[in-house]
């Protein structure tokens, strides 16, 4: 293998390295996985239950759909999918980034309000609101980013790749990262390609990789802090008496607990 020359052998080595990393991660041999920049898969999976997220100090953008031709996006967007991705996004903002009251902007699909906005995106936003998620929109993408409205939100949910990637690259051209939300492992990668043209020349800027490492460490610590108080919830201290509808407060299972002690 030569520097800057992708081959079948190098692709196979990358696949084996990733398979071994997943295996060791499942065994608990390490806590977070940071992957180096890789060449895009020419045949990526069309469906991904996880949420692809791009993050920088300025903006965080999640994608409802990925790797789809633009002509297929409208058909792929459903209320259920937006709600699912929006819920994952909200959880990640709270758990991975420790934003206690996350505000999410949902982008429109069309430059003007169309069928998808009225029949799909708006109902999805309303459903997210009923779940206690602060979701707003839909916002027209160019107006949203052009006016700087993204400053008012903790995350932006885009409908497809270019709608999120293009403004993200413009706003955060350096030191940004990409991660998968909605999976148990912490997996982060620098948000740029392998730059084969400068491979082996000692010219690459390591700051993006450094930022990916720091982000992964922060996410791991944030998850531990978020999960710790939820690991041992207090037992329910009352139950509903179905036979008469009365509520017996502080009903404890232990029969002898709270008994009046015998007189001495």
What are these regions (language model features)?
Residues 1-264:
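Anion-binding alpha/beta catalytic cores of soluble intermediary-metabolism enzymes, centered on
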């Amino acid at each position: 293998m030569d520097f800057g020359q992708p081959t079948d052998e190098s692709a196979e080595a990358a696949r084996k390295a990733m398979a071994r990393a997943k295996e060791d991660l499942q065994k608990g041999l390490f806590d977070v996985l940071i992957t180096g920049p890789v060449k895009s898969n020419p045949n990526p999976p069309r469906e991904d239950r996880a949420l692809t997220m791009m993050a920088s100090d300025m903006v965080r953008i999640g994608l409802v759909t990925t790797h789809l031709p633009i002509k297929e996006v409208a058909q792929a967007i459903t209320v259920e999918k937006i709600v699912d991705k929006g819920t994952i996004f909200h959880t990640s903002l709270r758990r991975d980034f420790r934003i206690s009251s996350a505000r999410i902007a949902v982008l429109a699909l069309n430059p003007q309000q169309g069928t998808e906005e009225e029949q799909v995106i708006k109902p999805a936003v309303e459903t997210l609101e009923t779940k206690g998620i602060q979701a707003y929109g839909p916002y027209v993408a160019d107006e949203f980013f052009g006016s700087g409205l993204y400053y008012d939100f903790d995350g932006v949910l885009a409908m497809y790749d270019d709608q999120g990637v293009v403004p993200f690259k413009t706003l955060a051209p350096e030191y940004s990262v990409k991660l998968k939300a909605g999976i148990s492992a912490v997996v982060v990668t620098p948000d740029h390609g392998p730059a084969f043209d400068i491979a082996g020349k000692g010219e690459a800027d390591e700051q993006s990789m450094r930022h990916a490492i720091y982000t992964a460490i922060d996410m791991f610590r944030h998850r531990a802090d978020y999960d710790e108080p939820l690991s041992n919830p207090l037992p329910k201290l009352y139950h509903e008496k179905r036979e008469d509808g009365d509520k017996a407060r502080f009903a404890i299972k232990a029969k002898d607990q709270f008994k009046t002690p015998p007189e001495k």
